[in-house]
UniProtKB/Swiss-Prot annotation:
UniProt KW keywords: Autocatalytic cleavage, DNA damage, DNA repair, DNA replication, DNA-binding, Hydrolase, Repressor, SOS response, Transcription, Transcription regulation
Organism listed in the record: Pseudomonas putida (strain ATCC 47054 / DSM 6125 / CFBP 8728 / NCIMB 11950 / KT2440)
Residue spans binding DNA: 28-48
Residue(s) at site: Cleavage: A88, G89
Pfam families on file: LexA_DNA_bind (PF01726), Peptidase_S24 (PF00717)
Alphabetized GO MF terms: DNA binding; serine-type endopeptidase activity
Name of the protein: LexA repressor 1
Role noted for this protein: Represses a number of genes involved in the response to DNA damage (SOS response), including recA and lexA. In the presence of single-stranded DNA, RecA interacts with LexA causing an autocatalytic cleavage which disrupts the DNA-binding part of LexA, leading to derepression of the SOS regulon and eventually DNA repair.
Active site: S123 (for autocatalytic cleavage activity), K160 (for autocatalytic cleavage activity)
Assembly description: Homodimer.
A biological-process GO annotation: SOS response
Catalysis performed (reactions): Hydrolysis of Ala-|-Gly bond in repressor LexA
Signal peptide: none
Amino acid sequence: MLKLTPRQAEILAFIKRCLEDNGFPPTRAEIAQELGFKSPNAAEEHLKALARKGAIEMTPGASRGIRIPGLEAKAEEAGLPIIGRVAAGAPILAEQHIEQSCNINPAFFHPQADYLLRVHGMSMKDVGIFDGDLLAVHTCREARNGQIVVARIGDEVTVKRFKREGSKVWLLAENPEFAPIEVDLKEQELVIEGLSVGVIRR
């Protein structure tokens, strides 16, 4: 690893503390707040510099996609973070707020889970995903037709079955009481946050 600047060393120490205390890394916003940066973008630039120097590894597109080589085992022992609630009905505003940690090995799921999302609503009940369940999610940005995804539309997220034809995407409920959500990618942005890889009943 190349020599770090004092500021980079501060950031690395903060990331280590979060991993050791919580089992998951901080967001860019949390780093900015801790270190007194004006915006998360400043934290992002420092993280990129740390990655170039080999001090950390970054997962593109994931708000907590930061790893420190050698500390993965401790993170696994701490389990998976439980992140807020995700609408399995009408979409709700999704702020990635970690409620607590669940003591389960991420490797229990395949592919490996990155976090757990609390489900709110009954739109996916016919595939066994109920209100209050914890959905194990593997972070990725692409999905195939038929997969159950966590999708972001604007600042809101929802859990649905994915279907795409050309520029049209349908997010399908597994409950006849809920209508499909139709998105035209030419007019509206839709982001795949991850794939469902399991459910923990609560």
